[in-house]
Regions:
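Hydrophobic, aromatic-enriched alpha-helical segments typical of multi-pass transmembrane helices
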Residues: 6, 12-260
Length: 260
């Protein structure tokens, strides 16, 4: 027969179990947030290598011969850029999945939409390396390209490099769109600061503006790029918060901890 003393302890036991469960859930949440943050950080390291460093180092504007000469002289660097795009595509897929795991408890529909839009980056990166591979083959020449004179090969290589850039402009559409559901999830999550979500929304609009100017109004691309830069720091702020701060306690978990 259960004693009266045992019955009076039941609420205390329930509170202890609830408290422990809350702490375990928070630990899991912090772990998942930091994992996603570290993957995102890896993406911010690999992506700029081909996107920014290679063009600024090897490409000479409106000079296919000089560009081809630079690629020949720094073939390993260019090949690393190709591999960097492949690696970025893989990391992008891992990031999308990790963020889905983190936010599916907030809103599964929004998390699924974020996953689908974020997933589109991976095939775009993989398809885009074909443009760089074609440019490299044209620069190197060989028996199969003997029908083309060197200036023709250099011009074709420049064309494929331009196509690579156009593909990036198209990809910015998805870079922007996937940030919108992610931003809403951050705002609703209660374990990340809301200002990060609002900044990500602005970041998404910045990418869309870059996409429109890159495809429709290329003459204004440099101007829009400079204006959009502060907004694009939203992703970096999100990454640093996830890595350094992780996830903060939900209001209900914090209340449970205080009550315990």
């Amino acid at each position: 027969m259960i004693s009266a003393g045992a019955i009076t302890r039941i609420p205390l036991i329930v509170r202890c179990i609830t408290h422990l469960w809350g702490r375990l859930s928070m630990a899991t949440l912090k772990r998942d947030a930091r994992i996603a943050g570290l993957i995102y950080l890896a993406l911010t390291i690999t992506a700029p290598f081909r996107l920014i460093y290679i063009p600024s180092t090897l490409f000479v504007h409106d000079n296919p011969a000089a560009t081809a000469g630079n690629i020949q002289a720094h073939e390993l660097m260019f090949r690393l850029g190709i591999f960097g795009d492949l690696l970025t595509g893989v990391i992008s897929l891992l990031l999308t999945f990790s963020l889905y795991q983190l936010f599916k408890g907030v809103n599964k529909t929004l998390a699924s939409l974020m996953f689908v839009l974020g997933f589109m980056d991976t095939p775009l990166y993989f398809f885009n390396v074909l443009n760089d591979a074609a440019a490299l083959l044209l620069v190197k020449g060989g028996p199969i390209l003997m029908a083309f004179e060197q200036p023709q090969r250099e011009a074709l290589a420049a064309l494929f490099l331009r196509l690579h850039g156009m593909m990036i402009s198209c990809a910015e559409m998805f870079w922007g769109l996937w940030l919108f559901p992610l931003a809403v999830l951050v705002i609703r999550s209660r374990f990340l600061p809301r200002f990060l979500g609002y900044w990500l929304i602005l970041n998404g609009f910045a990418y869309l503006a870059l996409c429109v100017t890159g495809v429709v109004l290329p003459a204004y691309e440099d101007v829009i790029s400079k204006l959009a830069f502060p907004l694009q720091l939203g992703e970096l702020a999100f990454v640093l918060w996830m890595v350094v701060m992780g996830a903060r306690p939900r209001a209900d978990i914090a209340a449970t901890s205080v009550a315990g």
